[in-house]
Amino acid sequence: MFRKIYTNISITLIKQLREASGSPINDCKKALESTDGNFEKAIQYLKERGLAQAEKKSGNQTKQGVIVAYTNNKVAALAEINCETDFVARTNEFLEFSTNFIKTVVNQEKDFNSSNIESVLRQSQNQAYFETNIDDKRKQLVGKLQENIVIGNLNAFVATNNSIFGVYQHNCLKSTICGLGGSVVELITEQGLNDVKSQILREGANNLAVTYLGLKPKFLYENEVASDVIDLIRKEVQRDFGSKTPQQQNFIVQGKLQNYYSDNVFEHQEYILNEDEPQTIKQYIKKELEDVIKDKVKIGRCLYLTI
């Protein structure tokens, strides 16, 4: 005979409900009491309670969380999934949700960004985990973990026939997909890809993703810098020209511009994974990629996110 608590609800049944739902023990007690011990109805009760709690907590600030980065070689995706505390961000339940979310996004094989997050949340793929759709699972998790959970930034990029993605995850949390920072870098060739070129470029893209997150550039290429920014730098330098000759003045201006490019433009920044042979990103691409695969390579879409 099981030991009874309250009416006719056994401890064993409460434990079974907790294992099935992941809800707190007191919530499981209440659910079974409210449904006269009917296990299936208690599951539904907890789901509905979780949805109600999600609505209540929807205004709570979410400053913690994880960055998830993932690619299946056809699509690369990067997203920020937020919660209220660092404690919840490190729970298995939160990390499992985050991992399944980003994999589901990638498996859609579509371009996504933060403007169409709502359409992503209605996705019903991966029903083994999400059951109905992503947003319903999110709301259930809010009720379970007792914190607001939101999908923040989201970007998914579909590769072309000439491009390949590299991803990097910084400060990984229990998996290589979830961490405190992440980045995506796309490399594009002129003449297309084959197996050998893909392998070389994938390694190169992964290396550049590490560097991209580490340096956090404002621009990829020098020609992306707005002319008014360049004019402002020139004006600042001209204040100290004094009696310098035009040749000296030009030398000073070019030096100042080069310093700005080195600090802010990815192609001019230092490749950080080769300390023995200092080289810029542009030099790395030329020597380690273009000269090896005998094809032109340029940087395409890039993105980084941090918590």
UniProtKB/Swiss-Prot annotation:
InterPro entries recorded for this chain? EF-Ts_dimer_sf, Transl_elong_EFTs/EF1B, Transl_elong_EFTs/EF1B_dimer, Transl_elong_Ts_CS, UBA-like_sf
Q: Which residues form the signal peptide?
A: none
Q: What is this protein called?
A: Elongation factor Ts, mitochondrial 1
Mention any additional remark: This protein may be expected to contain an N-terminal transit peptide but none has been predicted.
What are the subcellular locations of this protein?
Answer: Mitochondrion
Matching entries from Gene3D superfamilies are given as: 1.10.286.20, DNA helicase RuvA subunit, C-terminal domain, Elongation factor Ts, dimerisation domain
What GO biological process term is on the record, naming one? mitochondrial translational elongation
Molecular-function GO terms, alphabetical = translation elongation factor activity
Q: What does the UniProt keyword field contain? A: Elongation factor, Mitochondrion, Protein biosynthesis
* Any one cellular-component term (Gene Ontology): mitochondrion
Q: The organism sits in which domain of life?
A: Eukaryota
Q: What does this protein do?
A: Associates with the EF-Tu.GDP complex and induces the exchange of GDP to GTP. It remains bound to the aminoacyl-tRNA.EF-Tu.GTP complex up to the GTP hydrolysis stage on the ribosome.
Q: Which organism is it from?
A: Paramecium tetraurelia
Stated family: Belongs to the EF-Ts family.
| PROSITE patterns recorded | EF_TS_2
